[in-house]
């Protein structure tokens, strides 16, 4: 039921209004039905993008900016969703993306399927609490199954890591260049991975991504160092410095203006000359101080005066100005240097080291490359592409691929894709359900059906008959040795996905299942939807005027 205001009555029958005027309340089955409809609507929007043969979405914002993508997190982020249940799915997707960098569509679509199956059980008068309990038991069995069937992988298994990257990239718009991009991803992750105790750790902040419009996706390259998207400030400076000693400055190489307003009265031209000479001496002293430390490269976050540029060039020092703060922080980690805020405090111990600093022309722009840094746990990926939208989509694809390969390295477990895991879990859930018995059995079977719905969507997006292939896939999984059998969405054949190279991180699948189960059970538990009334502009204006009057009094 729904109502525009909540009204209670006293024993004498006198009505008591609880909510403000304009508020609305929907409760009981009607509230559940509305929430389920909202979740299903979001799922429908993402369904066609699922899998390597999924379609793309064109999203146009209020300013007319266009985004073409099939990245689940990006689509949901760009959609201006209003319903609270739909917003909940966006939060689930963001959490999944931040946690594992992939599996957002799996989490959202699976949430939608779980809610759909629950709706069917609700029509059979099965209470939501029983459905939630059954779903939780099914989730535990699903996670246990993945842990049992997953395969151990180490950072040295580069071929498996490459297949993980290829699997992630195959569903993106950049699939045509996936071989080249997969190699870059694996090289980047194996470079920055480090062993801490008995576990591998990957800090993706050590992988810098720089975008530059022009060329093609196949021109994308990995650089074992840091790229500063700036050019050398003075034409007289060297464009290449070997055995670079790098000063990282968070201070300007300019004459600082006084904080207070000050006037200088000049009575004759000689005083003016003295004033300018003094400014020049201040800048020269700053440059001399830098040179005394042995620095031959300066990366400055702030400005560099033309006079300072001249003196730096005379001393053969390569300088870059207006560098990003994040670039300075990355350089500090990579080169072993320290960012200094006061040039007078700069010493030789603050300098970073790199074997090569060089300015290179990329397309129409010049960039500074710092390679062979003291700490090798820092790499950069320079993305190229003919269109800006292609470059943006390549960045999204690379971030997902980097995240999935990093997940495998950190967790050390991988599984096959192509619907193999979902089918295997569904098979085990159907055997497990009768052991639980009662109405919960129906909820566990519904959970299994929801998992298989993911497989059917995968098949459907590949252009094949989902019912026919799902029956064949179920039959294949009856044999215990066929746990990795799934759907080849390019041929429509049932094949061993592991042998085919369709490999995914186990942790991504587990997180997606947990997130989807949590979201669906949360929605099923809601039986009351209370919406506050919107403030009218008139009332808001009157309130502001009254507040203003009080302030004046």
UniProtKB/Swiss-Prot annotation:
Keyword annotations from UniProtKB, A to Z: ATP-binding, Chaperone, Nucleotide-binding
SUPFAM superfamilies cross-referenced by the UniProt entry: GroEL apical domain-like, GroEL equatorial domain-like, GroEL-intermediate domain like
Region of interest: Disordered: 534-553
Record-linked Gene3D superfamilies: GroEL (3.50.7.10), GroEL-like equatorial domain (1.10.560.10), TCP-1-like chaperonin intermediate domain (3.30.260.10)
Pfam family, one: Cpn60_TCP1
Superkingdom of origin: Archaea
GO molecular function per UniProt: ATP binding; ATP hydrolysis activity; ATP-dependent protein folding chaperone; unfolded protein binding
Matching InterPro entries: Chaperone_TCP-1, Chaperonin_TCP-1_CS, Cpn60/GroEL/TCP-1, GroEL-like_apical_dom_sf, GROEL-like_equatorial_sf, TCP-1-like_intermed_sf, TCP-1_chaperonin, thermosome_alpha
Homology family: Belongs to the TCP-1 chaperonin family.
Family annotation (PANTHER family): CHAPERONIN
Subunit structure: Forms a Heterooligomeric complex of two stacked eight-membered rings.
Purpose of the protein: Molecular chaperone; binds unfolded polypeptides in vitro, and has a weak ATPase activity.
Listed name of the protein: Thermosome subunit beta
Organism: Sulfolobus acidocaldarius (strain ATCC 33909 / DSM 639 / JCM 8929 / NBRC 15157 / NCIMB 11770)
Lineage summary: Archaea, Thermoproteota, Thermoprotei, Sulfolobales, Sulfolobaceae
């Amino acid at each position: 039921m729904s109502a525009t205001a909540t009204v209670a009555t006293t024993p004498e029958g006198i009505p008591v209004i609880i909510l403000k005027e304009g508020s609305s309340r929907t409760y009981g089955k009607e509230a559940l039905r509305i929430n389920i409809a909202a979740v299903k609507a979001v799922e429908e929007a993402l369904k066609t993008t699922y899998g390597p043969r999924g379609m793309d979405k064109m999203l146009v914002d209020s300013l007319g900016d266009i985004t073409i993508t099939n990245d689940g997190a990006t689509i949901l982020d760009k959609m201006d969703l209003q319903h609270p249940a739909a917003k909940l799915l966006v939060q689930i997707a963001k959490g999944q993306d931040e946690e594992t960098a992939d599996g957002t569509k799996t989490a959202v679509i699976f949430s939608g399927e779980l809610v759909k199956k629950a709706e069917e059980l609700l029509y059979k008068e099965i209470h939501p609490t029983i459905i939630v309990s059954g779903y939780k038991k099914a989730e535990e069995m699903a996670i246990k199954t993945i842990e049992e069937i997953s395969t151990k992988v180490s950072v040295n298994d580069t071929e498996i890591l490459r297949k993980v990257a290829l699997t992630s990239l195959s569903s993106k718009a950049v699939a045509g260049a996936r071989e080249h991009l997969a190699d870059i991803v694996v090289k980047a992750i194996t470079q920055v991975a480090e062993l801490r105790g008995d576990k591998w750790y990957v800090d993706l902040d050590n992988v810098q991504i720089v975008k530059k419009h022009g060329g093609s996706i196949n021109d994308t390259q990995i650089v074992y160092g840091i790229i500063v998207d700036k050019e050398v400030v003075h034409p007289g400076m060297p464009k290449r410095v070997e055995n670079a000693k790098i000063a990282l400055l968070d201070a300007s190489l300019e004459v600082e203006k006084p904080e207070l307003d000050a006037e200088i009265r000049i009575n004759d031209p000689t005083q003016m000359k003295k004033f300018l000479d003094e400014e020049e001496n201040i800048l020269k002293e700053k440059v001399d101080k830098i040179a005394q430390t042995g620095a031959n490269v300066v990366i400055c976050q702030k400005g560099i005066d033309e006079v300072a540029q001249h003196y730096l060039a005379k001393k053969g020092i390569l300088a870059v100005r207006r560098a990003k703060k994040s670039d300075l922080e990355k350089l500090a980690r990579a080169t072993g240097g320290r960012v200094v805020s006061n040039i007078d405090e700069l010493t030789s111990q603050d300098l970073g080291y790199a074997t090569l600093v060089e300015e290179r022309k990329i397309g129409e722009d010049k960039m500074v490359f710092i390679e062979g840094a003291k700490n090798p746990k820092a790499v950069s990926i320079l993305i190229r592409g003919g269109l800006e939208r292609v470059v943006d989509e390549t960045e999204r694809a690379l971030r997902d691929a980097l995240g999935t390969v990093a997940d495998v390295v950190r967790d050390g477990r991988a599984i096959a894709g192509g619907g193999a895991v979902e089918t295997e879990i569904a098979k085990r859930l159907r055997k497990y359900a009768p052991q639980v018995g009662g109405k919960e059995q129906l909820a566990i079977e519904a959970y299994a059906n929801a998992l298989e719905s993911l497989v059917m969507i995968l098949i459907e997006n590949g252009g094949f008959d989902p019912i026919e292939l799902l029956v064949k896939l179920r039959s294949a999984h009856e044999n215990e040795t066929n746990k990795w059998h799934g759907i080849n969405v390019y041929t429509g054949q049932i094949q061993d996905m592991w042998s085919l190279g369709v490999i995914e991180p186990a942790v991504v699948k587990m997180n997606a299942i947990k997130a989807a189960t949590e979201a669906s059970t949360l929605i099923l538990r809601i039986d009351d939807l209370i919406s506050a009334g919107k403030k009218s502009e008139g009332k808001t204006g009157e309130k502001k005027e009254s507040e203003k009057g009080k302030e004046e009094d």
